[in-house]
Amino acid sequence: MIVLPNKVRIFINDRMKKDIYLGISNFGFENDIDEILGIAHLLEHLLISFDSTNFLANASTSRSYMSFWCKSINSATESDAIRTLVSWFFSNGKLKDNFSLSSIRFHIKELENEYYFRNEVFHCMDILTFLSGGDLYNGGRIDMIDNLNIVRDMLVNRMQRISGSNIVIFVKRLGPGTLDFFKQTFGSLPACPEIIPSSIPVSTNGKIVMTPSPFYTVMVKINPTLDNILGILYLYETYHLIDYETIGNQLYLTVSFIDETEYESFLRGEAILQISQCQRINMNYSDDYMMNIYLNFPWLSHDLYDYITRINDDSKSILISLTNEIYASIINRDIIVIYPNFSKAMCNTRDTQQHPIVVLDATNDGLIKKPYRSIPLMKRLTSNEIFIRYGDASLMDMITLSLSKQDISLKRNAEGIRVKHSFSADDIQAIMESDSFLKYSRSKPAAMYQYIFLSFFASGNSIDDILANRDSTLEFSKRTKSKILFGRNTRYDVTAKSSFVCGIVRGKSLDKTSLVEMMWDLKKKGLIYSMEFTNLLSKNTFYLFTFTIYTDEVYDYLNTNKLFSAKCLVVSTKGDVENFSSLKKDVVIRV
């Protein structure tokens, strides 16, 4: 670890795929409480800008921090990627503090599209922020556009809170001149912020929250000490369904269960977690997980690898102390309990955006202050991989699981999805057969539309047959290379329970690079949040799908795009009753 005079921390991480990865602690949307919710997220969208033909890049805003990364591709170099990312924050050697109203307006529209996307595909319910005075969704809404000047002032104010002590930088290689470049830019920031934010309100403990969730989860408040953080790292590397959350200076260990009986035993104090010393901790974490640790605990004064001897040699005492603290919090009701609930009728409170939720007090009724049993935890395997075809009945459940667990990755191709994970076969089956997970997986049917129409365009099966088997979709014909013939009509209007645009496009020079560039152009115009595309077996032919509230504008953009020599697009209007009759009148494609 290299520490600049203003406390910027720089790490060389030659294992990561990114060229540069930067995080800013104490800079997430928890800072929006008592201001305009969404300022942090809007700032993230305003800052990131790059040439998608030369770079891959992204950014994210969480409760307590913001992070950005950039990777060079094609003819660009690592040095180019580093300078591109730094340019998001500095202009002519000075920290950016000017944002045009037109750009703010476009990005607010993009935020509304992101809200729509996330609520169609996920359940975006941030319980901790809500209990601390924020909302269940804190990413920004379209009504921010009514206060553009105030929003701009808040954005400038937020930039002035950045200080060296908040900055963490991972670089793949620290090339010649790179360290000096960092000193001239992020190293020029004050060690402490020019504007000190107000303290984050303390979340309320001793609550039961009934909300959509794939698991029965208990958030246990523990002290944010070094030993507890090392204990969390030990548990995270060893077991599934254990993680942590922070808000302000508070730390919660999150423990999830698939069995309601075990969950209730844990809550009543009659059972403790069965934690055993079963392996050596290697700290082989992803760069995302490492960055999150440094940002959530900015007071860490050493490289995490400096603690690898301590976490292994002292694991017994660390885990005993952590177990005792967990149990004390259960007895004292320093917990937030999440109980899976999918009823739209049950509600006893709402946030300012009128999202309904049930919040109850966690009482001491039935507490047993002497545990007499232990609960086994799901152990991690080194690695596992499965391939699921689009016709497999478990397709959507596996997609749901990957969306709910950050350590599961999936890649999509023309035939199916390849999933990498570290679960045993028995544990995967137990999760997917659990009552709460099944309800959660089916509570957001919008994600299925992407695969319904992919099946329609790629297989040649009728929409009636596909809809009749929507729980499993239909297996594609892959024995022969399909030749897709486009019909005369380029637009088919349907009514579904989501608003989206999808279809197939073909072009002589069409490739993934041009589609990514197209996606970023649509994002800059505020018309979409993201766009998925799948390369079909027919030459230069892709299937596109994007959720959007601006369907006509997106259709017009795609319809007039000169890269497409042929196209067939479906435009969906959101409604209570599905109507796909337009797809039955003509033969849209012939396979």
Swiss-Prot record:
Protein name as annotated: Metalloendopeptidase OPG085
Purpose of the protein: Probably involved in maturation of some viral proteins by processing them preferentially at Ala-Gly-|-Ser/Thr/Lys motifs. Does not seem to be responsible for the cleavage of major core proteins.
This protein's UniProt keywords: Hydrolase, Late protein, Metal-binding, Metalloprotease, Protease, Virion, Zinc
Lineage: Viruses, Varidnaviria, Bamfordvirae, Nucleocytoviricota, Pokkesviricetes
Record bears the keyword Cell inner membrane: no
Primary subcellular site in the record, as a coarse category: virion
Location in the cell: Virion
Cofactor remark: Binds 1 zinc ion.
Gene name of the encoded protein: OPG085
PTM info: Undergoes proteolytic processing during the course of infection. May be cleaved into 46 kDa and 22 kDa products (Potential).
Coiled coil location: none
E.C. number: 3.4.24.-
Entries under Pfam families matching the protein: Peptidase_M44
Gene Ontology biological process terms from the UniProt entry: proteolysis; viral life cycle
Any single GO CC term annotated in Swiss-Prot or TrEMBL for this entry: virion component
Family to which this protein belongs: Belongs to the peptidase M44 family.
Domain of life: Viruses
Active-site positions on this chain: 44
Gene Ontology MF annotations: metalloendopeptidase activity; zinc ion binding
Keyword Ribonucleoprotein among record annotations: no
UniProt cross-references to InterPro entries, sorted A to Z: Metalloenz_LuxS/M16, Peptidase_M44
Residue positions binding Zn(2+): 41, 45
Cofactor names: Zn(2+)
